[in-house]
Amino acid sequence: MSTREENVYMAKLAEQAERYEEMVEFMEKVAKTVDVEELSVEERNLLSVAYKNVIGARRASWRIISSIEQKEESKGNEDHVAIIKDYRGKIESELSKICDGILNVLEAHLIPSASPAESKVFYLKMKGDYHRYLAEFKAGAERKEAAESTLVAYKSASDIATAELAPTHPIRLGLALNFSVFYYEILNSPDRACSLAKQAFDDAIAELDTLGEESYKDSTLIMQLLRDNLTLWTSDMTDEAGDEIKEASKPDGAE
């Protein structure tokens, strides 16, 4: 068994054990060998799943803490607010470190070595996703910079996807889903978000009969998420508790 194969196997073990930080470490080692051989679809997905879990836990924590902070502020509990702000800062530094980690791997290794269109779109979409996660909690100039980097990455991915991938391809659909969420949540452009999501959905519907069996499940799942978001965004009930904007969680789709 080669070192690369061993790291992939260890990453799978770490995933089964739900030790995602270690899964990231193993897959980062694999990612740094792409100068010799590009990541397989399986390896690419393992890397994505590892980072998705590590970042996902912190994003969830940040949202909960931010919500508590708002409630305490509305009650005027200044002592509590000060404690919460410090704690939120700790979570934000973890988020920054994770995002910087994968963005460095993408920039230094994965994007330069990607040759098939599918790989390029996957990695550029991933780059956009992790800049978007930074934009979720950064403020001022840092938020603006993260948002601009997100837009550039998603736009580059979108140009390649439109030219090279079928409208029903799960990676193209996942990109459209996350790009539309970016317009809605980060740029506060609901019209652009709806337009992008609707276009992606309609283009896929028009070619649904060409969808292969292997990606049918993934593609139709992301199409459903696009439709869910469109329903949510076009309704007047976006402030209702329980309404949640959808991102695809599968690596072939979206982060």
From Swiss-Prot:
Name of this protein: 14-3-3-like protein GF14 psi
Induction line: By cold in an abscisic acid- (ABA-) independent manner (at protein level). Repressed by phosphate (Pi) deprivation. Induced by nitrogen (N) and phosphate (P) deprivation in leaves, but repressed by potassium (K) and N deprivation in roots. Repressed by miR396.
InterPro entries for this protein: 14-3-3, 14-3-3_CS, 14-3-3_dom_sf, 14-3-3_domain
Keyword Cytoplasm: yes
PTM sites of type Phosphoserine: 66, 189
Record's subcellular location: Cytoplasm; Nucleus
Keywords for this protein: Cytoplasm, Ethylene signaling pathway, Nucleus, Phosphoprotein, Stress response
Main localization of the protein described in the UniProt heading: cytoplasm
Phenotypic effect of disruption: Short primary roots and reduced size, with smaller cells. Disturbed levels of several metabolites (e.g. beta-alanine, threonic acid, phenylalanine, 1,3-diaminopropane dihydrochloride, citrate, glycine, aspartate, glucose, 1,4-diaminobutane, proline, palmitate and shikimate). Increased miR396 levels in plants lacking simultaneously GRF1, GRF2 and GRF3. Higher freezing tolerance, and greater levels of cold-inducible genes and ethylene- (ET-) inducible genes leading to higher ET levels, as well as slightly enhanced expression of ACS6.
One Gene Ontology CC term in the entry: plant-type cell wall
GO biological process: cellular response to nitrogen starvation; cellular response to phosphate starvation; cellular response to potassium ion starvation; cold acclimation; ethylene-activated signaling pathway; regulation of metabolic process; response to cold; response to freezing
Assembly notes: Component of a DNA binding complex that binds to the G box. Interacts with IDH3, AGT3, GLN1-1, GLN1-2, GLN1-4, SAM1, SAM2, MDH1, METK3 and MDH2. Binds to 1-aminocyclopropane-1-carboxylate synthases (ACS) such as ACS2, ACS5, ACS6, ACS8, and ACS11. Interacts with FD. Interacts with DREB1A and DREB1B in the nucleus. Interacts with CINV1.
Gene3D superfamilies per UniProt: 14-3-3 domain
Listed GO MF terms: ATP binding
Signal sequence bounds: none
Family according to the record: Belongs to the 14-3-3 family.
Reported function: Is associated with a DNA binding complex that binds to the G box, a well-characterized cis-acting DNA regulatory element found in plant genes. Involved in the regulation of nutrient metabolism. Reciprocal negative transcription regulation of miR396.
SMART domains: 14_3_3
Modified residues (Phosphothreonine): 162, 210, 238
